[in-house]
Amino acid sequence: MKSHIESLLEQTIESFKQQGIVPADFQARIQVDRTKDKSHGDLATNLAMMLTKVAKKNPRELAQLIIDTLPASSYVAKVEIAGPGFINFFIDDNALANQLQQALTSDHLGVALPTKQTIVVDYSSPNLAKEMHVGHLRSTIIGDSVVRALEYLGHNVIRQNHVGDWGTQFGMLLALMEELRAANGEQAKMELSDLESFYRAAKVRFDESTEFATRARQLVVALQSGDEYCNKLWREFNDISLSHCHDVYKRLGVSLTRADVHGESAYNADLAQVVKDLDAQGLLSESNGAKVVFQEAFRNKEGEPLPVIIQKADGGYLYATSDLAAMRYRSNVLKADRAMYFVDLRQALHFQQVFSLAKLAKFVRPEMSLEHTGFGTMNGEDGRPFKTRSGGVVKLVDLLDEADVRALELVRSKNPDMDEATLTEIARVVGISSVKYADLSKNRTSDYIFSFEQMLSFEGNTAPYLLYAYTRVAGIFKRATDIDLSQAKIVLEHEKEKDLGTKLAQFGEVLTRMTDKGLPHVLCGYLYELASEFSSFYEACPVLAAETEAQKQSRLLLAQLTAKTLKTGLSLLGIETLERM
């Protein structure tokens, strides 16, 4: 409906141009919003006030002129002027009912698909050689939910897991392995737990020994230069680490696969060319032996230019170098129209600099959109970054294990007579869903407090509440197995039917808002509101005990569309639904 009203207003602006009311080259930014008070209609626009200056007319006069010029539409019951010049649209109940009826049989619940784009989404991207920790959670699940929604809207989405499989951490591992082999000539078979402790030991040596640190950096350069021995060990380290990552992805219900891994090492052969191309354009400068780029727009508090370091004095490359190579690949090879980077907000300056440099150096096509969709931190209940009691980093698998245990206790307390296998499966879904939803339901740009007690609550905007809401709606059809809805029609008579129908019709708008800015919390908020709206409808409007057969069938169709929308919305968040809880 919102897009339909926007289209009517766009046609009105074109008519104004032809009449000379606004200049022929005028570009209007049409904004249509949902009203908070239904007495003011369903949708409203401030277009008249926006046009006042250019049309040289007062807002209320312009508002009336807009109404008089609007093309006729069966979707609009009436249009009114409010206040200084707001235009309020009242949607026709029959038109809304028809839209909902069509949504029931549509492949995409009636959602209008946008122009198809090729969109690269860079997310998760953990540094390898160590286990995933809670700091990897946000990028992984926020990115995955946006990917799912983009694909649902028909876009060609290319997942890119830009893992940190190159760099100093591998130099440390190689240097320690070199020392151990020199000492005893043996190579222990590495399991993941060994790799984790191996990394910690290497880090201690790196921090304590200047000689070891120097050797580690030399081995990084050797690795980047294609040394066969270094590459063999590097592949072993990576294989162990990636196996762990994909075990975590599977447990989280994340759609990333091995085929999506395109880490820093994938661009190793291009790094020297990046340096050459920047040099050929006269963009490189030298600073303390390193090759850097200064851009006028980026300065520190003292007004001194901030460098983008492209190549270190020892010949090694940095994140900026591989990021530039990746951007060029994504633009020129993958032909991306848009690239979204789900990376911590603390990297904002880095991305501002490399995005600017990629455009300046013409590494990406001018029309390609580069977007840093950053996020805040997950904090403990003390408001500080989430840590173990001893102050260490919390492994992601440990967090998920605890979620399983707590969810099992919760589910068992509510279903004491349920068999253990069913309890365990329900608890698995509730536990993982609660961790994911608690994160996704927060604005990604904000920090948030991680609390098991809050996320496992059956009250408020939580996964258990929504999972239960879905089972409640789906449960209606377990009691209505003999009802034929093939000829049923949706009729909106009761106020609560209209409210539920209006909310159901907003699904497409919500997905557009979510994918435009990479904001899963918008979808979470909508699903919570939809579940709450259905609860109000269900209390006020008997479904199976409706007064007439036609009314019962209409309300069953509304329940059916609600169930489909909840299930689809939760699946786009990467959350499984349950048929019983």
From Swiss-Prot:
Its main location: cytoplasm. This is Arginine--tRNA ligase. GO terms for biological process: arginyl-tRNA aminoacylation. The keyword ATP-binding applies. It comes from Shewanella frigidimarina (strain NCIMB 400). GO terms for molecular function: arginine-tRNA ligase activity; ATP binding. Transmembrane segments: none annotated. Its EC number is 6.1.1.19. GO terms for cellular component: cytoplasm. The keyword Ion transport does not apply. It is found in: Cytoplasm. A motif ('HIGH' region) lies at residues 126-136. Keywords: Aminoacyl-tRNA synthetase, ATP-binding, Cytoplasm, Ligase, Nucleotide-binding, Protein biosynthesis. Belongs to the class-I aminoacyl-tRNA synthetase family. Monomer. It is an enzyme of class 6 (ligase). InterPro entries: aa-tRNA-synth_I_CS (IPR001412), Arg-tRNA-ligase (IPR001278), Arg-tRNA-synth_N (IPR005148), Arg-tRNA-synth_N_sf (IPR036695), ArgRS_core (IPR035684), DALR_anticod-bd (IPR008909), Rossmann-like_a/b/a_fold (IPR014729), tRNAsynth_Ia_anticodon-bd (IPR009080). It catalyses: tRNA(Arg) + L-arginine + ATP = L-arginyl-tRNA(Arg) + AMP + diphosphate.
